[in-house]
Amino acid sequence: ASLPSTENTPSGYDNVQNTARGFDWRNDQPASIVYAMPLDSGYIKKKVPFHDAVFALEAPFNGTPKELFKTENRYSRTNWGNDQVALVSEQLRSKQQYKVSLYNSKSNTISTLYEGNSTDMYNNPGNPVTEKNSFGEEVLAISKDGQTIMFNNTTGASAKGDLPYLAKFNIQTKSKEILWR
């Protein structure tokens, strides 16, 4: 592979090299690689409607990559569940902001689930609960009706101290219910 020199990578938070990055397997598919490409030439301060585009390339990896979605901030990662439920994380480290969206690859739609400040531990939902799928890969644990995912917050910061919790999150109503604390 031929990669550009990192000497010319723009400095500063949220700036990235102007090339593909964040290569990862799409855990809900048998053999598909996902990666991000900057749409702003790597400069976050560039005024564009979307800063990154995320692509997938299926085995045998010699076809044309398919664009899955675009992000308004810098793409961080995707927690895959199935072809209708995936959590897309994007962030602006310089402003300590994050956003998590619901991506449905079947209908090719993406919608914001929640946003927050990375230093606000009181409102941190925690990490999504996962389970192994038929490929032996970790994917989101989704309820049978496809409406609910689980979050595990091992810190559970609150005004009363750290109280870890397990919560269910309805992806349609965007409501959280703490099951155990």
Predicted regions and their residues:
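Beta-propeller folds
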Residues: 1-181
